[in-house]
From Swiss-Prot:
One of its GO terms (cellular component) is ribosome. GO terms for molecular function: ribosome binding. It is found in: Cytoplasm. This is Ribosome maturation factor RimM. Pfam families: PRC_RimM, RimM.
Length: 170
């Protein structure tokens, strides 16, 4: 069984689909249907523990995704899964080229200017049409575009910090 640090959040169960226990899935992957390519899924329980779940089917449905799990054969059983995060083992993720990172690895990093001034911590990220955006929580919230080599000068996952070319007054 994987440890909690070995599971990377990749989506969430967001609703029910039909009467046979299928669920609607919101995917953080790009493209969104790539989450269906991962063979091992885990669900995060309310207590924070990740538990393995066997996905028996999954497909694109309209503008979203739907999935079925073993032993979940009706809406009542499927309802218990709504709101649970979907994670995959880190070992299943492909290696990324330099300058690209999984969001889960960036969340929680301490952010500093190139001059060493603290800006806060990366609380989360979101995607825009142009680029991803870091949301920093510190003395105030800051939104910083994630543009490697420009606003993002250095990422040190081992040290838990990210260096940004960013005016602390902005």
């Amino acid at each position: 069984m994987e440890g909690a640090d070995d599971i990377v959040p990749m989506g969430e169960v967001v609703g029910l689909h039909g009467v046979r226990g299928w669920v609607k899935v919101y995917s953080h992957t790009e493209p969104r249907e790539a989450i269906l390519d991962y063979p091992h899924w885990y669900l995060r329980r309310d207590d924070g523990d990740w538990v393995p779940v066997e996905r028996t089917a999954g497909r694109c449905q309209g503008k979203g995704l739907v999935a079925a799990f073993r032993d979940v054969e009706d809406r009542d059983r499927a309802r218990a899964y709504i709101g649970l995060q979907i994670g995959v083992p880190r070992r299943d993720l492909p290696e990324l080229p330099e300058g690209q990172y999984y969001w889960a690895d960036l969340e929680g990093l301490a952010a500093y200017t190139t001059g060493g001034e603290p800006l806060g911590r990366v609380s989360h990220l979101f995607a825009t049409g142009a680029n991803d955006v870091l949301v920093l929580q510190g003395d105030r919230e800051r939104l910083v575009p994630f543009v490697y080599g420009q606003t993002v000068r250095r990422v040190d996952l081992t040290a838990g910090r990210i260096e940004l070319d960013w005016d602390p007054d902005f």
